[in-house]
């Protein structure tokens, strides 16, 4: 009989929550400045952040890039219906596509929900006709083009 060891859920205290809230808004803040805001030393803040990283609470630090500022003007949400036996295969291929920014398996008849960004309509059409439609198991594709973004948040906010 084998037992898998599971790490128990990490209990966050108020200081951890403060650190996460500040990092969510100001990911480039120094340990020293963060320590001043939460009344801890630089070393104590660094130790807590390392613990949060090791526990998987913090998955990564990243820069949020404005696509329009670098010439990417088409943002599209896709619902892709896939035959159940091909779902994993299609998902693995789509997650490798540079234009795909997020990909989720949703409830419903083998639905993949996906977001993609493209420089123009022609690039999106090429993605559809040459990359998505030919995938084995794809039954149907429904897409909606983003008109205006009101809110977009990376990660979870406490």
Curated annotation (Swiss-Prot):
DNA-binding region: 31-50
Kinase found in the keyword field: no
UniProt-listed GO biological process terms: response to amino acid
Gene symbol of the encoding locus: ywrC
UniProt xrefs under CDD domains: HTH_ARSR (cd00090)
Entry annotated with the keyword Transport: no
Coiled coil location: none
Name of the molecule in the record: Uncharacterized HTH-type transcriptional regulator YwrC
Keyword terms: DNA-binding, Transcription, Transcription regulation
GO molecular function: sequence-specific DNA binding
GO cellular component entries: cytosol
SUPFAM superfamilies assigned to the protein according to its UniProt record, in alphabetical order: Dimeric alpha+beta barrel (SSF54909), Winged helix' DNA-binding domain (SSF46785)
Domain called HTH asnC-type: residue spans: 12-73
